[in-house]
């Protein structure tokens, strides 16, 4: 099975070390463009663009990278409760059309009540997933070309429709990650690819089996992906030394502050990440070559595969054997590590190198009439 390898655009900051200004660098458009172009040339399938108040806006960043890349896809966040499904569907179709079918979407429900309140969202965990399920149903139907009337608990639309369809049919693929039962149910019923953070393989296997069974109950099959950091070097010793350097400027106070911030979230996945290290520096290798040091101060994906190319490739293939076909990777700093992964790791894997998409012909059309419909030629009788 060929593997889809993704990279990451660090719109929330980048540098040589975690938890410090030491070795950091400005993250401006030129730097993000360098990373995107490197990923494009090296054969990555796409890039994940993060979302949240600590990040630049993912949609604007993605749009700005379209003209400077050729085949790279952009995995961009959909934010239920923050954006209406109709507006999000229009944005999705436009991004897909402007990129010639290079748009992918990542459903993000949110997990930090403090940040959500700042965005005007006051739903609890269960309510957010209810809203996300309704949002996704409407979003998908709109991209399928339906005119939608929907009266749910959280979402109400009447006569919603898109005038401009996406390039990818039936719609651009929808990614999603969540560890709670309600999150897995949403994934099983509505998404195309279920993402998990990089837990030890035995825990990932349990998740995949649970989601696969839930999807089968809905008569569906979905794909699987994993989100990981990577520290790959020419030798295993060099890789482990690089891992230690990454956290060499971290102090206990910074770790404690980060863990306190993570503790206020209601994300089951974040709780599972924190349990892998319990906020302590010792015993960070939680599974062979799987290191939890990143999660001491970084929210979300907090583990890294560490080793030389053949070693890391063997661990990736262990995940692939569980049914995972997509790997969303990152490393610090992201420009240099994009090259290291491409040069030291890719030769040891069966990597699916994307082709440059051919321009898709679009039907000619006149200006929309009354902001309501596209004029079509009428056959003369």
UniProtKB/Swiss-Prot annotation:
GO molecular function: alkanesulfonate monooxygenase activity
Reactions performed catalytically: an alkanesulfonate + FMNH2 + O2 = an aldehyde + FMN + sulfite + H2O + 2 H(+)
UniProt keyword annotations, A-Z: Flavoprotein, FMN, Monooxygenase, Oxidoreductase
UniProt KW Nucleotide-binding keyword: no
Further comment found in the protein's record: FMNH(2) which is absolutely required for this enzymatic reaction, is provided by SsuE.
Protein's GO biological process: alkanesulfonate catabolic process
Protein name: Alkanesulfonate monooxygenase
Upper lineage: Bacteria, Pseudomonadati, Pseudomonadota, Gammaproteobacteria, Enterobacterales
Alphabetized NCBIfam families for the sequence: alk_sulf_monoox (TIGR03565), PRK00719.1 (NF001939)
Coiled-coil ranges from the UniProt annotation: none
């Amino acid at each position: 099975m060929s593997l889809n390898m993704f990279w990451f655009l660090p719109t929330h900051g980048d540098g040589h070390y975690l938890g410090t200004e030491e070795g950091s660098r400005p993250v401006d458009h030129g730097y993000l463009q360098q990373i995107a172009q490197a990923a494009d040339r090296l054969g990555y399938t796409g890039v994940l663009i993060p979302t949240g108040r600590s990040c630049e806006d993912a949609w604007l960043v993605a749009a700005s990278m379209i003209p400077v890349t050729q085949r790279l896809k952009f995995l961009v966040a959909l934010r239920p409760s923050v954006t209406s499904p109709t507006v999000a569907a229009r944005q999705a179709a436009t991004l897909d059309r402007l990129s010639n079918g290079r748009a992918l979407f990542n459903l993000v429900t949110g997990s930090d009540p403090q940040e959500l309140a700042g965005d005007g969202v006051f739903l609890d965990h269960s309510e957010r997933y209810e809203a996300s399920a309704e949002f996704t149903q409407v979003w998908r139907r709109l991209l399928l070309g339906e005119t939608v009337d929907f009266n749910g608990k959280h979402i109400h639309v009447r006569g919603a429709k898109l005038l401009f369809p996406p390039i990818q049919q039936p719609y651009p693929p929808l990614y999603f990650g969540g560890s709670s039962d309600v999150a897995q149910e949403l994934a099983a019923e509505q998404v195309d690819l279920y993402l998990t953070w990089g837990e030890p393989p035995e825990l990932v296997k349990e998740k995949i089996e649970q989601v696969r069974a839930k999807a089968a109950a809905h008569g569906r099959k979905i794909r699987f992906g994993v989100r990981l950091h990577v520290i790959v070097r020419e030798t295993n010793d060099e890789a482990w030394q690089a891992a230690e350097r990454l956290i060499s400027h971290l102090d206990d106070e910074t770790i404690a502050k980060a863990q306190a911030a993570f503790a206020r979230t209601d994300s089951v996945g974040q709780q599972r990440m924190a349990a892998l290290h319990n906020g302590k520096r010792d015993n960070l290798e939680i599974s062979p070559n799987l290191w939890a040091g990143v999660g001491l101060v970084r929210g979300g994906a907090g583990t890294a595969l560490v080793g030389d190319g053949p070693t890391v490739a063997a661990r990736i293939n262990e995940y692939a054997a569980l049914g995972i076909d997509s790997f969303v990777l990152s490393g610090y700093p992201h420009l240099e590590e994009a090259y290291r992964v491409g040069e030291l790791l890719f030769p040891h894997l069966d990597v699916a190198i994307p082709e440059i998409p051919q321009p898709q012909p679009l039907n000619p059309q006149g200006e929309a009439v009354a902001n309501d419909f596209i004029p079509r030629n009428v056959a003369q009788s």
